Amino acid sequence: MSLTEARFHDLVDATQQNIEDVFDDSGLDVDLENSAGVLTVKFEGGTQLIFSRQEPLRQLWLAARSGGFHFDYDEENQCWACDSSDELLSEMLERFTVEQAGVELDFSEI
């Protein structure tokens, strides 16, 4: 069963807040901007992670230095999974943070 619009927005809002919390708690020098449902994480070296919601598809999209990725929410496992690789959003974020900032962060709770 697909997500309702309200459930989708609640999930994306919570996920974006959890991502912000991980970066805030890390002490890493990043700029966080959340505007109109788009979360942008700007790293010291100029690279970015951009999270946006695609309401018609009920997907969370991520733009990173290595490309663009689309995530569907898996209600059974309560996680976002990439629609092309099934890799979890949390795993990708851990990898991208190392690639773009040289720091390991734990996103397992998002």
Curated annotation (Swiss-Prot):
InterPro entries: CyaY (IPR047584), Frataxin/CyaY (IPR002908), Frataxin/CyaY_sf (IPR036524), Frataxin_CS (IPR020895)
Top-level division of the source organism's lineage: Bacteria
GO biological process: iron-sulfur cluster assembly
GO CC aspect terms: cytosol
Gene3D superfamilies, A to Z: Frataxin/CyaY
Protein name, UniProt field: Iron-sulfur cluster assembly protein CyaY
Keyword annotations from UniProtKB, A to Z: Iron, Metal-binding
A Pfam cross-reference name: Frataxin_Cyay
